[in-house]
Amino acid sequence: MPLICADITIPANTPQTSPVRVQVKVPAGVIRKVWVLIPYGHKALAHLVIRHGETQIIPWYGDIHGDGEQLVFDEVYELPTDDVLTLEGWNEDTVYDNRFIVRLLVLPKPYAYPEIYSLQALRKVLEVMGIE
């Protein structure tokens, strides 16, 4: 069950029109949880979004910003094959670079959807027993 760890450092005066982008390789599976650590000192001046291709997946709209907090997103986002996510950030701070730390929990489908796979296994057992 891969825990993907990544971070992005955004230089001071990085405009939204020309953001910093960091690509993160992720295995096929289901993204079930995302943690974003915003260190103290950001003063809500640095901003982050996570994209899959052109689609923004975290957050669904707006952007992540804050100061000295950890955000946790319970997610269900399927990646049918090994793929790449993009951390995209900009920084309105005129003096300091700012960094976001990101963790992604990617589960194989049987672990992400245990109820579905349990029912399928039960159906197979009943079928073998001649019970439908």
Model-derived regions: residue spans:
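Beta-strand-centric surfaces of beta-sandwich/beta-rich domains
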Residues: 1-29, 35-132
